[in-house]
Amino acid sequence: AKSTIDFIEAHCFDTDGRMYFEVTADGRPLRKRRYVFSESFAAIAMAEYAKASGDMTYAEKALNLFKDIRRFIATPGCLEPKYLDTLQAKGHSIVMILINTASRIREVISDPVLDQQIDESLESLKDFVKPEFKALLEMVGPNGEFIDTINGRVINPGHCIETAWFMLEEAKHRGWDKEITERALQILDWSWQWGWDEQYGGIINFRDCRGLPPQDYSQDMKFWWPQTEAIIATLYAYEA
C-alpha cells in the first residue's frame, strides 16, 4: 500500500494539482480526464492508509486533497463540461461519491468541511429523485428539471444502490437518522425494482425511466460492481 501511495504522489499529479487518469508503468502521463474521481479515490486511499499505518500526515493529505476537489468543482472553467452550453445539466455520480469520500476522511481527521459536504450532497440528491418514475436519475437540469432525452432518462441501478448504501451509512453515523434512512430505503427499493433481472438474477447496468431502450452498449450486462454494491446496501438496509 505504501509503495502505491508513493507512486501516486510521485507520478500521478499534474502541476495544477489535478490527477492524471492513466500513466505508464514508469509514471509518465498518458491521459487526464474532466472528472475528479481519481482525486476522490486517492483521498480515500490516503485516509485508509493513515488509519492502517497510524501515520496521520496522510490524513492531512487526504483532507487537503478533498479541499482541492471542492475547489476544482467550484471554479468555473477548471473542469471541462460534459456538454456544450446548449445543455445545462448536473450529474448524480459526483454528488454521490463525495459523500463516501468525506465520510472516509472523517474517520481519521475532523474538519467542518467534511460534514458540510455530506449535508450538501444529501440535499442535492433530492433533485435527482423522481417519484413519478420511482427512480433516481443520473442527470437532471441545474434545478432538478427532468431532461426528456435518451441521456436524461438514464437510470443506473448500481449507482443508485451505491447512493442508498452511502446514505444508510451516514444515517447510521447519525444514530439512524429517520429521514435519511427512509429516503435511502426508498431509493434502494426503487433501484432494485429497476435493476433486478427477474429471469436470471443480478443487477443490470442501465434502464430508461420511460421503459425505452437505453443507449449504452452494456445496458443489459451485469458488471461486478453493481452486485457488490447491492450486497453492501442490502446489509445496511437489514441493519436499519
Language model segments and positions:
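Glycan-recognition and catalytic cores of secretory/periplasmic carbohydrate-active enzymes
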Residues: 1-240
